[in-house]
């Protein structure tokens, strides 16, 4: 099973962030432009939360808040679940399923060094399974 470190080597470590002072509209526009589902929210270079599509769907739309006036900080998820570079992709999947989340910021010594999405996890697991299938096919073919 791959580690978060290995996954980030393939995926890359870039993380899109936004200031807590930004508006929800600013956040949504950046997410749409970058084709991503979340932004890590920062204050004084420190991670203080995450803003996701689900935050918008659950906390802005239904409450009829104005995205141009609502600050991202007001609707972001504060109880951040993170992983470190040494955790496995399987551990990430379990965290995501158990906590009903789609994004995991990756921290190293208190610093944000990447982010993993549910799509990254699924892709990695599929690639690993395909590798094992090919190994089994080769083994079976070699027995004939």
Where are these regions (language model features)?
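Structural motif
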Residues: 15-16, 38-39, 48, 73-74, ...
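Short, charge-rich amphipathic segments
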Residues: 22-33, 64-75, 110
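A glycine-centered beta-loop-beta connector
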Residues: 31-34, 39-55, 96, 104-119
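A positional/architectural concept
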Residues: 2-48
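Tandem CBS (Bateman) regulatory domains
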Residues: 1-13, 52-81, 88-97, 118-144
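The conserved cystathionine-beta-synthase
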Residues: 18-35, 82-100, 107
């Amino acid at each position: 099973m791959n580690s978060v470190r290995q996954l980030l080597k393939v995926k890359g470590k870039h993380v899109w962030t936004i200031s807590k002072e930004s508006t929800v509209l600013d956040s949504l526009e950046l997410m749409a432009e970058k084709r991503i589902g979340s932004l890590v929210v920062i204050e004084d270079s420190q991670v203080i939360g995450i803003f996701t599509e689900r935050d918008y769907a659950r906390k802005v739309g239904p409450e009829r808040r104005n995205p141009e006036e609502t600050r991202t900080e007001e609707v972001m998820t504060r109880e951040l679940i993170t992983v470190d570079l040494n955790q496995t992709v399987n551990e990430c999947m379990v965290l995501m399923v158990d906590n009903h989340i789609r994004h995991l910021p990756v921290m190293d010594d208190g610093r944000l060094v990447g982010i993993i999405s549910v799509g990254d996890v699924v892709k990695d697991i599929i690639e690993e399974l395909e590798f094992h299938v090919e190994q089994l096919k080769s083994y079976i073919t070699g027995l004939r």
